[in-house]
């Protein structure tokens, strides 16, 4: 009886030890930078009465480790004519995103041009800033508009 109690006790101790210890490696992040499918997104002839098409580009992590994106920011903020959608979420500022090794992320952009009652074409510009590992990277946004 005493032996079976000791065996049971040791099995509980071993089971507890195995459940507390983990075989999973700690997550380490890459020190690399992002790469992009395009460095400039251009919208050609956007009319003020009609919205633009939605353009997309890809953000790549070419490294063998997960990459932590500290910030993605539409620099014009809420006052920008451009709108962005990152990973299915609309907004102007995104933070603490993780991009797995050899993976990519879609970023969608559209624009609305405000009328100015002029006859000359308008140029609307903004930039998307990416902060990763202390490095700033920019993607330019340019739209040609007309009333």
What are these regions (language model features)?
Residues 9, 52-54, 125:
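Short beta-strand-initiation
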Residues 115-145:
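Terminal connector regions
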Residues 1-10:
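Bacterial N-terminal signal peptides that target proteins for export
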Residues 19-22:
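C-terminal motif of bacterial Sec signal peptides marking the signal peptidase cleavage site
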Residues 24-45, 51-53, 62-115:
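Surface-exposed binding patches on compact interaction domains or structured appendages
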Residues 56-58, 106-110, 127-129, 140:
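Beta-strand secondary-structure signal
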């Amino acid at each position: 009886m005493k032996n079976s109690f000791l065996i049971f006790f040791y099995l509980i101790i071993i089971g507890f030890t195995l459940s507390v210890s983990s075989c999973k490696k700690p997550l380490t992040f890459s020190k690399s930078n992002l790469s992009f499918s395009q460095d400039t997104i251009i919208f050609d002839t956007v009319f003020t009465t009609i919205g633009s098409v939605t353009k997309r580009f890809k953000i790549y992590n070419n490294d063998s480790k997960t990459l932590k994106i500290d910030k993605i920011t539409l620099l014009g903020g809420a006052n920008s004519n451009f709108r962005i959608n990152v990973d299915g979420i609309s907004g102007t500022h995104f933070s603490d995103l993780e991009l797995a090794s050899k993976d990519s992320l879609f970023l969608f952009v559209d624009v609305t041009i405000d009328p100015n009652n002029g006859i000359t074409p308008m140029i609307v510009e903004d930039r998307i800033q990416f902060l990763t590992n202390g490095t700033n990277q920019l993607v330019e946004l340019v739209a040609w508009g007309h009333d």
